[in-house]
């Protein structure tokens, strides 16, 4: 199993798909990295040799932040928004949608589970 950027890539998948298992690498960036490394996209992960893995690691370091570095940068950006007190920072702080989505209905992913409000009891005679 090839281990790149601290992630074990699935052996049976093509390398262009396997690289997308790394946080921060999508389809297009995967293709760019393979082109820089000079590796064919159709090769399987199990067929990579050590020199090809090293070339991928080198191309990856040159091109993008991935995994832990990227996650920490995103967290720092969110923290900065909260510290400066801008609208997006307030939305993050309150746990509400940030990008202008509606909140009257939906928004359950961001707000969490439904909070049920009890109705008033009807008095029976």
From Swiss-Prot:
Region named Disordered: 95-125
PROSITE patterns in the record: RIBOSOMAL_S13_1 (PS00646), RIBOSOMAL_S13_2 (PS50159)
InterPro entries recorded: Rbsml_uS13_C, Ribosomal_uS13, Ribosomal_uS13-like_H2TH, Ribosomal_uS13_bac-type, Ribosomal_uS13_CS
Domain of life from the UniProt record: Bacteria
Keywords, comma-separated and alphabetical: Ribonucleoprotein, Ribosomal protein, RNA-binding, rRNA-binding, tRNA-binding
A biological process from GO: translation
Transmembrane segments: none
Gene3D superfamilies: 1.10.8.50, 30s ribosomal protein s13, domain 2
CC annotations in GO: cytosol; small ribosomal subunit
Composition bias type Basic residues, residue spans: 105-125
Coiled coil (residue ranges): none
Gene Ontology molecular function: any one: rRNA binding
Role according to the record: Located at the top of the head of the 30S subunit, it contacts several helices of the 16S rRNA. In the 70S ribosome it contacts the 23S rRNA (bridge B1a) and protein L5 of the 50S subunit (bridge B1b), connecting the 2 subunits; these bridges are implicated in subunit movement. Contacts the tRNAs in the A and P-sites.
Similarity comment: Belongs to the universal ribosomal protein uS13 family.
HAMAP family: Ribosomal_uS13
Subunit structure: Part of the 30S ribosomal subunit. Forms a loose heterodimer with protein S19. Forms two bridges to the 50S subunit in the 70S ribosome.
Protein name: Small ribosomal subunit protein uS13
Gene source species: Leptospira borgpetersenii serovar Hardjo-bovis (strain JB197)
Lineage, top ranks: Bacteria, Pseudomonadati, Spirochaetota, Spirochaetia, Leptospirales
């Amino acid at each position: 199993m090839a281990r790149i950027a601290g992630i074990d890539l699935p052996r049976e998948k093509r390398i262009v798909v396997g690289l997308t298992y790394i946080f921060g690498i999508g389809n297009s960036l995967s293709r760019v990295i393979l082109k820089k490394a000079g590796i064919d996209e159709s090769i399987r992960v199990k067929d990579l040799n050590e020199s090809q893995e090293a070339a991928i690691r080198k191309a990856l370091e040159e091109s993008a932040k991935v995994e832990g570095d990227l996650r920490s940068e995103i967290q720092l950006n969110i923290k900065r928004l909260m510290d400066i007190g801008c609208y997006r920072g307030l939305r993050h702080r309150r746990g509400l949608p940030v990008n202008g989505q509606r909140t009257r209905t939906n928004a359950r992913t961001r707000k969490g589970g439904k909070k049920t409000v009890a109705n008033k009891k009807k008095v029976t005679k």
